[in-house]
């Protein structure tokens, strides 16, 4: 039983690390998309057609949603780890 518990703790620790990495990468992607949206929006006034494709806004919104899901998953994994 001790080996199984130790293995579970090790797996949970790795999952926590990977979720932390995922949070960082997704946050960076969201920030870069927001920067791009801001720049394109500023240039919109100089063009006859909108420069910001709707897909870009959706991608930013989906990244935000993904961040919330990853964060929730990380909290659950941390809680499980503390209870072991």
Predicted regions and their residues:
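Amphipathic alpha-helical hairpins/coiled-coils and adjacent low-complexity
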Residues: 2-84
């Amino acid at each position: 039983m001790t080996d199984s518990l130790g293995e579970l703790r090790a797996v949970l620790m790795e999952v926590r690390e990977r979720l932390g990495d995922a949070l960082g990468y997704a946050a960076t992607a969201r920030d870069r998309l927001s920067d791009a949206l801001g720049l394109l929006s500023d240039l919109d006034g100089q063009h006859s057609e909108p420069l910001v494709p709707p897909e870009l806004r959706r991608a930013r919104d989906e990244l935000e949603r993904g961040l919330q899901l990853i964060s929730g998953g990380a909290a659950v994994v941390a809680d499980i780890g503390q209870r072991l």
